[in-house]
UniProtKB/Swiss-Prot annotation:
One of its GO terms (biological process) is bacterial-type flagellum-dependent swarming motility. InterPro entries: Phosphatase_YcdX_put, PHP_dom, PHP_phosphatase, Pol/His_phosphatase_N, Pol/histidinol_Pase-like. Binds 3 Zn(2+) ions per subunit. It comes from Klebsiella pneumoniae (strain 342). Keywords: Hydrolase, Metal-binding, Zinc. Homotrimer. Zn(2+) 3 binds at residues 73, 101, 131. GO terms for cellular component: cytosol. Its EC number is 3.1.3.-. GO terms for molecular function: phosphatase activity; zinc ion binding. This is Probable phosphatase KPK_3500. It holds the Pfam family PHP.
């Protein structure tokens, strides 16, 4: 089990079913030390208002030894790599994920998807790309992995892609893991939980990584400190409350 989970949704995204408190309780039960709440960006139909994201400042950083990161799963909106996270949202959040979602960016062709994803990474706003192995959004995998390494953006291996969403992602995700390995980049594991019961569940991710002999030293979830060092290297201010995580 990894002690960090970087992708989950609360009832603020109304197709999800758990609260912040639910996730804290489950993290304590499972031994998760650090997690990020990453509700959908405002351009999704059932996403929270941007006030939800800027008001995360009222959350405690640490509850009963569990660290909480303030995040978003933003939407890549166009071929220029624009995301629905800007202004005060950018400065209020610790972790900015970006990905393709059909209601915001209808599937197009491989070159368009690749150009848009690389542009989002090149913007400097994004720390992590969500479910890049989605077969509905094919990309040039070597080009994406090389760009992610160049811009220091993690590519996600998303556990729910192998269970309940994005059917047919396995081959793409194995290829992505191998390409990230060869490019010297980072992978991030996300449960993509829409209920707290699946927090920290990475069983299927582990199978993908094992299949390509992915190096443990390039997985951000191995420890809170590794993840925090990565975010700090990307400009996130150090968070004193997390010093002992």
């Amino acid at each position: 089990m990894y002690p960090v989970d970087l992708h989950m949704h609360t009832v603020a995204s109304t197709h999800a079913y758990s609260t912040l408190h639910d996730y804290i309780a489950e993290a304590k039960r499972k031994g998760i030390k650090l997690f990020a709440i990453t509700d959908h960006g405002p351009d999704m139909a059932d996403a929270p208002h941007y006030w939800h994201f800027v008001n995360m400042r009222i959350w405690p950083r640490l509850v009963d030894g569990v660290g909480i990161l303030r995040g978003i799963e933003s939407n890549i909106k166009n071929i220029e790599g624009e995301i629905d996270c800007s202004g005060p949202m950018l400065t209020s959040l610790d972790l900015i994920i970006a990905g393709f979602h059909e209601p915001v960016f209808p599937p197009q062709d491989r070159d368009t998807h690749t150009q848009a994803m690389i542009a989002a990474m090149a913007s400097g706003k994004v720390h992590m790309i969500s479910h890049p192995g989605n077969p509905k959004f094919p990309v040039d995998i070597p080009a994406i992995a090389e760009a992610a390494a160049r811009y220091q953006v993690a590519l996600e291996i998303n556990n729910s892609s192998f269970i309940s969403s994005r059917v047919g992602s396995e081959d793409n995700c194995r290829a992505i893991a191998a390409a990230v390995r060869d490019a010297g980049g980072w992978v991030a594991l996300g449960s993509d939980s829409h209920t707290a019961f699946t927090l920290g569940e990475f069983t299927e991710c582990r199978k993908i990584l094992d299949a390509v002999d992915f190096p443990e030293e390039r997985i951000l979830n191995v420890s809170p400190r590794r993840l925090l060092n990565f975010l700090e290297s990307r400009g996130m201010p150090a968070i004193p409350e997390f010093a002992d995580l």
